[in-house]
Structure formats: C-alpha cells, structure tokens
C-alpha cells in the first residue's frame, strides 16, 4: 500500500449532482424544476409562512405581550457559585468579572439562593440580592449591601 494508491471506501463519497448540463445527465434543460410556474423561475417560491392566500397561521393568532425597551437585565450569580471565592472576599461586579464567574455586568448583578453557601464570611456589594440569598449569606457570617 502506497499513498498514491489510497482510495475512499466505496459509497462513502457521493458525487455532487450538477444540474443543467445536458439532457443525458437526467437533470439537464429544466434542471429538475419541472415545466413552467413560479417555482421554476429564478428567485421563485413563496415566502416562509405563506399558505396560498389563506390568512397565515401567525396572522390568525392574536398578538401577545410586549418588549419593554427600558427593561433591566441582571447578570445572575447563585450561592453555589460564590463558593469559588476565598473566605472573607468582597463580592462585587468587578471581582466577579475578574474571577470569570460572569462575562458581562449588564444592568448589575443579582445574587440568587440556588445551591448552598459553605461557611464563608463574604461581603456582598451588588445591585440586587434575593431574600433567601441574603438570609443565607448573613447566616454564614457575611454581610450584604445592595447598591
């Protein structure tokens, strides 16, 4: 066996079908598009959701809700994630980004009570803290300051 004699396994590679290259190819002339009509033309076809003139499903459904352009989106940090920090550390948006716990501060940081906080005296200075998270941090001997 030599490098120049290597071949792909039979049936592992399929030859690309080139359309419009003569009638004997099986896909010449109309290139597999059939005869006349919208779908045979270049750029032909209907837009997504079009149902032949019948009112489309998405138009039959009622509108719901709205998107508040002034919404505040917080970077979420759970108690179990705070266990990565050393004892006595100050938890702020800057320290969390530096520790690569969060990527982006967004409108601020919110601490939630998912998971357990092992006994650590943390000083938490963030935008928002849930009531359960605040209780857990203070029970572990830490302090919470909401900015």
UniProtKB/Swiss-Prot annotation:
Transmembrane segments: none
Protein function: Binds to the 23S rRNA.
Positions with biased composition (Gly residues): 23-35, 42-52
Provenance organism: Lactococcus lactis subsp. lactis (strain IL1403) (Streptococcus lactis)
Name assigned to this protein: Large ribosomal subunit protein uL15
Subunit record text: Part of the 50S ribosomal subunit.
Domain of life where this protein originates: Bacteria
Region (Disordered): 1-57
Xref: NCBIfam families: rplO_bact (TIGR01071)
One Gene Ontology term, aspect cellular component: cytosolic large ribosomal subunit
Family the entry assigns: Belongs to the universal ribosomal protein uL15 family.
Example GO biological process: translation
UniProt keyword terms in alphabetical order: Ribonucleoprotein, Ribosomal protein, RNA-binding, rRNA-binding
Single GO term (MF): structural constituent of ribosome
Any Pfam family the entry gives: Ribosomal_L27A
Segments of skewed composition (Basic and acidic residues): 1-13
